[in-house]
């Protein structure tokens, strides 16, 4: 088990808040100057991930914070996109993996494509697990936090977190005056999908036709439409963390990301699918009462 999980939550609050403020400032400046395209420029391709210019802002903040954190309190391992060696990075750099007090898995901007064009909020996602070496899995995560990364037009932004076995928590920040207010987390209480949002993830062209056909057949079965108007509404929110958020606060009733299943069936390369860091805040959803299962 993790020692003093609340202290870890406090660190995540600080780090996430720095990310939110820096990215919002960059978006606001780009919006004013009409230079949003600069944030969407490809900066690098590393570890199988496309790194956009906006990603580099977040990477620098996380690296600097982890350096200070490790120097003050002892070694840690950061697991994130764009890092070589299977995404693992030890802080301080002369420490050994096995000496790390914990593993920090981080997706700095989940939904980069939403944010870099200033279209829709993305999310900073992080989870902390005891160091069980390379055998550590998402199930081992005991602390998780997700923070909304809003567009330059937003007034409010959410932050949610959980400690395993202690429930999930939510705070809303006013981006204009910095004030914060605790808020409830309440998934939908409806017992059907009718007159609500439910979706099968199909963000990109490969496999979209097959996934859309499956979606149509599925909803015809579970929410048959006998009238003129559709009963199930679709929202392709291109961020796994954002999808979980929509379920947690009752905006959505059902979401399934079956891209790897369809890609395998169709003989397509498994590109742009959900990675472990994309789903590292699943603990928050479970603690909030969302039912999370695999494809089986």
Label each residue range with its predicted role:
Residues 1-109:
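N-terminal subdomain of lithium-sensitive/metallo-dependent phosphomonoesterases centered on the IMPase/IPPase/PAP
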Residues 9-12, 16-19, 23, 27, ...:
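An extended, acidic
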Residues 45-51, 110-114, 230-234, 270-271:
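A short glycine/serine-rich beta->alpha loop
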Residues 49-57, 115-119, 238-241, 272-279:
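Short, conserved micro-motifs enriched in small and acidic residues
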Residues 56-61, 72-81, 124, 242-257:
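Conserved long hydrophobic alpha-helices within structured protein cores
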Residues 62, 66, 124, 128, ...:
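Buried hydrophobic packing segments
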Residues 71-74, 136-139, 191-192:
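Short helix-terminating capping/connector loops at secondary-structure junctions
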Residues 97-165:
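DPxDG-like acidic metal-binding loop motif
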């Amino acid at each position: 088990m993790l020692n003093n999980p609340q202290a870890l939550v406090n660190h995540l609050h600080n780090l996430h808040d720095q990310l939110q403020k820096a990215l919002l400032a960059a978006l606001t400046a780009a919006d004013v100057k009409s230079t949003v395209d600069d944030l969407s420029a490809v900066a690098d391709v590393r570890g199988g991930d496309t790194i956009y210019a906006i990603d580099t802002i977040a990477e620098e903040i996380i690296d600097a914070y982890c350096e200070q954190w490790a120097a003050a309190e002892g070694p840690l391992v950061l697991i994130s996109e764009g890092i070589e060696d299977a995404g693992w990075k030890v802080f301080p750099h002369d420490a050994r993996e096995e000496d790390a007090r914990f593993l920090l898995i981080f997706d700095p901007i989940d939904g980069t494509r939403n944010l870099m064009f200033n279209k829709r909020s993305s999310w900073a996602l992080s989870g902390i697990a005891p160091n069980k070496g390379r055998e550590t899995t998402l199930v081992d995560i005991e602390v998780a936090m997700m923070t909304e990364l809003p567009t330059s037009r937003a007034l409010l932004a959410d932050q949610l977190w959980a400690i395993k076995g202690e429930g999930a928590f939510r705070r809303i920040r006013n981006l204009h005056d910095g004030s914060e207010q605790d808020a409830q987390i309440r998934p939908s209480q409806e017992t059907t999908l009718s007159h609500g949002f439910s979706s099968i993830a199909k963000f990109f062209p490969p496999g979209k036709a097959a996934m859309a056909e499956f979606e149509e057949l599925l909803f015809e079965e579970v929410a048959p439409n006998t009238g003129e108007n559709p009963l199930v509404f679709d929202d392709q929110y291109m961020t796994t963390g954002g999808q979980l958020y929509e379920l947690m606060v009752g905006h959505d009733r059902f979401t399934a990301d079956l891209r790897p299943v369809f890609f395998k069936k169709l003989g397509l390369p498994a590109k742009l699918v959900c990675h472990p860091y994309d789903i590292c805040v699943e603990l928050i959803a479970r603690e909030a009462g969302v039912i999370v299962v695999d494809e089986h």
